[in-house]
UniProtKB/Swiss-Prot annotation:
Role, per record: Deamidates glutamine residues to glutamate on methyl-accepting chemotaxis receptors (MCPs). CheD-mediated MCP deamidation is required for productive communication of the conformational signals of the chemoreceptors to the CheA kinase.
Enzyme Commission number: 3.5.1.44
GO biological process: chemotaxis
HAMAP family: CheD
Protein family per UniProt: Belongs to the CheD family.
Name of the protein in question: Chemoreceptor glutamine deamidase CheD
Natural source organism: Shouchella clausii (strain KSM-K16)
Amino acid sequence: MTKGETISIGEWKVVKGEGVLRTCGLGSCIGIVLYDQERVIAGMVHVMLPDSTKARKGANPWRYADTAIASLQAELKKQGARKLCAKMAGGAQMFKHAVKREFMQIGERNAAAARETLARLGITLVAEDIGGTKGRTIQYDVKTGELAVRTVHHGQMIL
């Protein structure tokens, strides 16, 4: 994986033309890429939680799947994107003891919220690598449209 624009938890970035977007440390968090391949523009966000409705006033909206995806879509359209598609990875179950407690299944809930938000916004989810018990690092090449997903102890795959 090459270096590029790095996105941390609750952050987002947009790249036009050539460039790379990457995020590390995706455990239960999800890295979501929205892109317009024809216009060669993409944005990535690293979300931590599924739903902003119970967030404290003034909380960072980029940490929540429901608000982050909608905000990233608006930013990309403002910068010229038209037909957006999505790829995403992450959503692991990082704590074995939490499997029986639904509220602790953050990865699964993050993935469901992301899928639901993408569908509501009319954004096609083209590919995903979700779940499991291992952390991930992802890197999106804006020019080629490839999302490289590196999973701990499992190597790399291209979506």
